[in-house]
Every structure is written in structure tokens, then in C-alpha cells.
Amino acid sequence: MKNILSIQSHVVYGYAGNKSATFPMQLLGIDVWALNTVQFSNHTQYGKWTGMVIPKEQIGEIVQGIDNIGELHQCDAVLSGYIGSAEQVEEIIKAFHKIKERNPKAIYLCDPVMGHPDKGCVVADGVKEGLIKIAMAQADIITPNLVELRELSGLAVENFEQAIEAVKVILSKGPKKVLVKHLSRVGKNAAQFEMLLANNDGIWHISRPLHNFNKEPVGVGDLTAGLFLANLLNGKSDVEAFEHTANTVNDVMETTHNAGVYELQTIAAREWIVNPKSQYKAVKIG
């Protein structure tokens, strides 16, 4: 069994961060070590929430605690998502380095959550800069959305061709794999939900249906990053993991849409997480 240290947010009500990613990864046979960067009543896109940011020291203390009992070498990967403070970025990288000392084969997936003010997604000052200046170069895999793709690459990215250039720029900065979670308005077809995968062997594009919600569910990116990493650890190739992830997320979104609710319906879609009914295929474009 593979083990992932998943360092991201926790919400008591609803689905975002670890709450969105942990159960699907467990369904895929992964033992998830969930370390929460914040504990909130609900996700920030409700516009109001209660809770706290976990003190930055706790990240290192908890990782050290696992090391103290001699089990840190079992960690196969680190996944970071929503980060509660700029200081936490450095602590996460320190934690990854300690894990690499115990298991040189361990990998790091950075889901570079930078916030989206238009959607009400709020992150602390300095987090974006830490992700760009510190985390990106350390990550084996990085999973930006369109906003984050622009920030990480330093390019405007106003069309599909520029998105291709942006992923190439990011590959040159350290990551070995770039998964663009949603191309949004720079995709080929505005009526589809489109994603990109890039590695040193090429670039792949996949399209699936775009489900229209009155209020777009939160936690989809967290689900996407977790599924992709879990699939890789389970031995799938990059493209196989990409396809399984896109198809699973589509099935979760369809289940959520059919239920007519705001929060992701990962439990209701559990069957499709293991064996997705969608069968969309990635196309190599570069």
C-alpha cells in the first residue's frame, strides 16, 4: 500500500481540501496521512466561515513526530494544496526534504492554490509568492488552473497556443509533470471542460462535458490533484492517470449536478471513483 502525506485545508461541513481529496484517494487504495493547514467550518466561497489557520510549527512538529516513531520512510509522496500562511510554504518544503532523506524515491505534488477573488477563494498574503519562488522548483508535479498557470509561467495566456507555451515554461522551472486542471476560456471549445498534461515526452489534451451549475462546486481541483497522484502511485502511466482522473471527476460532477446540490457528491459517486463510467481519451498534441 502506498502512503501520501496530504497537507491542505480541512472543512468540517462540505468538501474542499483534504475533505475532498482524502476519501477518493483511499478508495483507490492509498493510505492518506492528512495534515490540515487550516480547520474551517466551511470553505471560503460561502463568503463567511469560522475556524483557524494551523500554526506553521505544527507541520514540522507532526512530521517529526512520525519520524520519531520510525515510520516516515513509509511516505511515498507529499501532496500540498490550500496553504494557510506564507510561512507554511517553507515548512511544507522542509517536511518534504526530511521525507526525501528517509525515502529518496518520495515525490511531491504541489497543487498551487493561489485564490480567486472573483469566486471568493481567499488565500493569505505571501502564499502566492511562496508557491512561485519556493514550491514550484521543488515539485515533481504541479497542477495549476488557468489563473495559476499565468502566475507560475509569467505569461498572459489568452489563448490555447499560449497555454501550451506556459506549460513548457513551467517544465523548464523544475516540475517534471504539469497538469492544467481547467483551461477555462483559453480552451479549444467553450462548451467543453478541457485539461492539459505535459511532461518531457509531450503534451496531451482531454475534453469532457462542461456541467453548468447555478453555483460552481468547490474542491474539484483538490479532487483532481489527489486522484492524479493516487493513480500515479498505483502504477498508471502519466496518460493513464490523466484519463482516469478526468473521467472520475466528470462522473463526480455529473452525480453532483444530478443531485442539484452545491457540495461535491464524492460519497454518492464512490463507485465511479474506482471504476469511472466516463471513457474520454487524451489526445497527444505536442
Curated annotation (Swiss-Prot):
GO cellular component: cytosol
Metabolic or biological pathway: Cofactor metabolism; pyridoxal 5'-phosphate salvage; pyridoxal 5'-phosphate from pyridoxal: step 1/1
Record-linked InterPro entries: PM/HMP-P_kinase-1, PyrdxlKinase, Pyridoxal_kinase_PdxY, Ribokinase-like
CC cofactor: Mg(2+)
Binding site for substrate: 9, 44-45, 222
Enzymatic reactions: pyridoxal + ATP = pyridoxal 5'-phosphate + ADP + H(+)
EC number: 2.7.1.35
GO molecular function: ATP binding; magnesium ion binding; pyridoxal kinase activity
Keywords: ATP-binding, Kinase, Magnesium, Nucleotide-binding, Transferase
Keyword tRNA processing: no
Binding site for ATP: 111, 148, 181
GO annotation (BP), single: pyridoxal 5'-phosphate salvage
Subunit structure, as described in the record: Homodimer.
Family matches, as NCBIfam families: PRK05756.1 (NF004398), pyridox_kin (TIGR00687)
Protein's job: Pyridoxal kinase involved in the salvage pathway of pyridoxal 5'-phosphate (PLP). Catalyzes the phosphorylation of pyridoxal to PLP.
Family from the record: Belongs to the pyridoxine kinase family. PdxY subfamily.
Protein name: Pyridoxal kinase PdxY
